[in-house]
């Protein structure tokens, strides 16, 4: 199927993918006077008297803003807010179709972190949560961290944490397949940008102790003096053996390779230098860091990619619909590390011992159990950590 042609036809014929659907009928004078003036003034008065009643009388409790400035859209780069709108519409569709969460795409003409922060704070009263999307690094770090501190609704940068949660879920099961433990394995991550950094943080939360991050200049280590602040931080908290060099040196004896970088950077020969029963997650799209057959030829036992035409697809849609559903259901103030880890285990545990195998470490995108399992786990973790208001 020619997906490019099909996508153009879909978007043109429907004039986009989302619209507004009224929940109430306005067919009589009484309907009009109830839905709008004068009747509408009464819920306004109630909310004025008790601002929390906005959740009772409006759509806020199940409505997420999908916010982007279009500076890092898919593999297209900085294409601007207008060109990024089809992606944000798509995100809204997935939130609704998979999680039952209403969402509205908002593409803003704002490049600096300060402008994006100001825009999100200005619209926050309308929404129960904010999904940040396709905002370039390093600005995305400051934007998310600031909004998390200053807003009382959950803010979630899916490019970072959605990827990290699903990778963690997949690795939990991959390690179960090969009989290794998170705290014992040597992990190499290639590409410590927004997603890569979040993956490292998530794996550390899950118990990983030996992670080496590798960028285009080589391994990150204490005193590596990177021009990017988050990489200097990674150099301080990872690479306990202070391995220096490039990907070749980092991979010697490694148990796990995680790539969020560029096509073809991992070779069969490099895979052969890894530990027995190696695990490779090659998630560059559309062409991964190494193709599955090449990795298997190098002795890799468990392989995952971001593609739907290979086994073990690492797909964010397994995470964000259920995560927002769960967070909104308890009116969470935040999405914290414990909620993210709960989501990862909820996804992983859907694959039973009997079903788990080298080519089945993560549920499929259309598994109907996923969103509710994630929502339940996230809601409980929110209660356990004191960020739930219900």
Regions found by a protein language model. Give the residues of each.
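General beta-strand structural signal in soluble alpha/beta enzymes
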Residues: 105, 131-134, 155-158, 189, ...
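Rossmann-like adenosine-cofactor binding region
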Residues: 232-301, 307-309
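Short, ordered loop/turn segments at secondary-structure junctions
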Residues: 69-71, 79, 108-109, 134-137, ...
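N-terminal ligand-binding/catalytic initiation module
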Residues: 1-155, 375, 380-381, 385-389
